[in-house]
């Protein structure tokens, strides 16, 4: 595909995404399923606009690659070491158990035992792209079940290497003498990548950042991700695993957040392209001729994987309320199956339509996951939010609250407790099941649900409430909720939590003026106490704190247009010098006006 064809394909992809995803969101089936349906519509078995599916599918894997890089940035080597038990324990158990059961069933379906083994391994894998996307949408990424799900996915990526090596052995086409030299060279190259990345990446990015040109920094980030993916692909290893390692190596660097901001737009677009490509690969001809076989295989695949994952989650000690989410989010087949089954087909392991049937099963299983998650979400909402008696009441009670608090983590808890202590009527919404269960045991009225859903806000009393306090962990959720409230509940007074200056800029641009930066107030208070401990008069220290807060807020507002540009660094330095000059002038005047005011606690 080249030239005008490539441009036409790009336009078709963008049109399909723009048309299908908002429609899917309106229907409440999620963006992922919208992308899949869009792919079916424009693919060879739909309207037939695009026929070269394999090439596009390979290119669109870059979406998964970028996603794994960002996941790597959110971890560090010490955190990865802490997850070793769940990665090599639960992850290995899931792959082996699921593969064994599924391989046995494929043998009963007249697959050769070699093809059944490959089929079982391929079907045992889950979709990294879909699972991580859904976990983020459902707020699972910070929960115990989300961490366990990520560990299982990471082991599956590691299992790609031996699984691909197993195919020629099963086909009987492996070299008589195993080439240990090639294996040793791959291991050596992998080690060089790790060591080189460990000691070279930070100095290189420090040099690039010194240029002050954001575009160059973005280009360098893309170069790193694509080079790591290409290098791992040349070694015959998982591209996603390579970029994940690159992300982990940079997780503790000072450029972590800038790297994430540079990659995020590309990740979203390419992930959408990946799901559209998967939808295009669905062979409707095979589905039509083997409808009962495919339908049964999809149900069996999802049920077996859910049962296996649920059992492992129980053995691992995951809360009962989180096990169903964990089991369902990993219940589908994954993108790795396309690679493994294609390799097996080239070795003539499959007969007739067997490969096509397996690929259709994988694709349809991916389409069931968003619907399954939606159903489980509703079931959990009714179960967790329902009254003690089995009477008919809404799944979130509208108690005519004055305030709706979104998020009941450490930040949200303090706000909610203060409001309740002052007899304010509040409703708390939280999508971490574990937190909901724990807080309800202590008597807090906390409801489970995703506050970015309009109907949940409406049933929680948003139409009658006076204010909403947004304390989400993820800035994306905060901004989405702000836009939602401004559109559907414009009367609400919005107050929000900002993790840092970038989030504060975004809130100001969205028209939210009442916000609190996560550590700013506590840091100022500790700074005031430090000034007093160094001999400054308590009243003078208090005034210094107030001056600093006021001038820092002014600087924050002045830098709004530049918040996404590296020019902000020089602007911030100028503002800091101005702040110091004003501060010194005011403090000199303050020293002449001190009275006998003393500190009190």
UniProtKB/Swiss-Prot annotation:
Residue stretches spanning the membrane: 4-24, 29-49, 55-75, 87-107, 111-131, 152-172, 177-197, 207-227, 230-250, 262-282, 284-304, 324-344, 356-376
Domain RCK N-terminal: start-end pairs: 400-519
Assembly and binders: Interacts with the regulatory subunit KefG.
GO BP term, pick one: proton transmembrane transport
Compartment(s) of residence: Cell inner membrane
Native source organism of the sequence: Salmonella typhimurium (strain LT2 / SGSC1412 / ATCC 700720)
Protein name: Glutathione-regulated potassium-efflux system protein KefB
Family: Belongs to the monovalent cation:proton antiporter 2 (CPA2) transporter (TC 2.A.37) family. KefB subfamily.
């Amino acid at each position: 595909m080249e030239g005008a064809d490539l441009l036409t394909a790009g336009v078709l992809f963008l049109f399909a995404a723009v048309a299908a995803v908002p429609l899917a969101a309106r229907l409440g089936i999620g963006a992922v399923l919208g992308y899949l349906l869009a792919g079916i519509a424009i693919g060879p078995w739909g309207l037939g606009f695009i026929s070269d599916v394999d090439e596009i599918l390979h290119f669109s894997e870059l979406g998964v690659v970028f996603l794994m890089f960002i996941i790597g940035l959110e971890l560090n080597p010490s955190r990865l070491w802490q997850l070793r038990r769940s990665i090599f324990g639960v992850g290995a158990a899931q792959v082996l158990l699921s593969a064994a059961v599924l391989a046995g069933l494929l043998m009963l379906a007249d697959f050769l035992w070699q093809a059944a083994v490959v089929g079982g391994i391929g079907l045992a894998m889950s979709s990294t792209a879909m699972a991580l996307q859904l976990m983020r949408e459902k707020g699972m990424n910070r929960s115990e079940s989300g961490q366990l799900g990520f560990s299982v996915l990471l082991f599956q990526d590691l299992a790609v290497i031996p699984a691909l090596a197993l195919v020629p052995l099963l086909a009987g086409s492996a070299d008589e003498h195993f080439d240990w030299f090639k294996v040793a060279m791959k291991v050596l190259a992998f080690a060089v990548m790790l060591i080189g990345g460990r000691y070279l990446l930070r100095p290189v990015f420090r040099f690039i950042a010194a240029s002050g040109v954001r575009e160059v920094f973005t280009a360098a980030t893309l170069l790193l991700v694509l080079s790591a993916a290409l290098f791992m692909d040349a070694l015959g290893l998982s591209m996603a695993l390579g970029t994940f390692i690159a992300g982990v190596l940079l997780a503790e660097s000072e450029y972590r957040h800038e790297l994430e901001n540079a990659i995020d737009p590309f990740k979203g677009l390419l992930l959408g392209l990946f799901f559209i490509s998967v939808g295009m690969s669905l062979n409707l001809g095979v589905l039509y001729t083997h409808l009962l076989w495919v339908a049964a295989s999809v149900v069996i695949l999802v049920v077996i994987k859910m049962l296996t994952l649920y059992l492992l989650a129980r053995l691992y000690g995951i809360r009962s309320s989180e096990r169903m989410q964990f089991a369902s989010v990993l219940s589908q087949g994954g993108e790795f199956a396309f690679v493994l089954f294609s390799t097996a087909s080239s070795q003539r392991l499959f007969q007739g339509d067997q490969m096509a049937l397996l690929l259709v099963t994988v694709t349809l299983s991916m389409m069931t996951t968003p619907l399954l998650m939606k159903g489980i979400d509703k079931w959990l909402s009714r179960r967790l939010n329902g009254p003690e008696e089995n009477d008919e009441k809404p799944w979130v009670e509208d108690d005519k609250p004055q305030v709706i608090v979104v998020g009941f983590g450490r930040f949200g808890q303090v706000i909610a407790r203060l409001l309740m202590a002052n007899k304010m009527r509040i409703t708390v919404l939280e999508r971490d099941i574990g937190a909901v269960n724990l807080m309800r045991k202590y008597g807090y009225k906390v409801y489970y649900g995703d506050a970015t859903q309009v109907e949940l806000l409406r049933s929680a009393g948003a139409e009658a409430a006076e204010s909403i306090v947004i304390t989400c962990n993820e800035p994306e959720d905060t901004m989405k909720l702000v836009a939602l409230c401004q559109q559907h509940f414009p009367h609400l007074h919005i107050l929000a939590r900002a993790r840092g200056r970038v989030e504060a800029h975004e809130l100001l641009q969205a028209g939210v003026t009442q916000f609190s930066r996560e550590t700013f107030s506590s840091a100022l208070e500790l700074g005031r106490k430090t000034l007093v401990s160094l001999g400054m008069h308590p009243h003078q220290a208090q005034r210094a704190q107030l001056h600093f807060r006021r001038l820092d807020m002014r600087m924050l507002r002045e830098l709004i247009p530049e918040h996404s540009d590296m020019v902000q660094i020089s602007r911030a330095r100028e503002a800091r010098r101005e702040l110091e000059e004003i501060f010194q002038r005011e403090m000199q005047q303050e020293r002449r006006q001190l009275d006998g005011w003393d500190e009190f606690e």
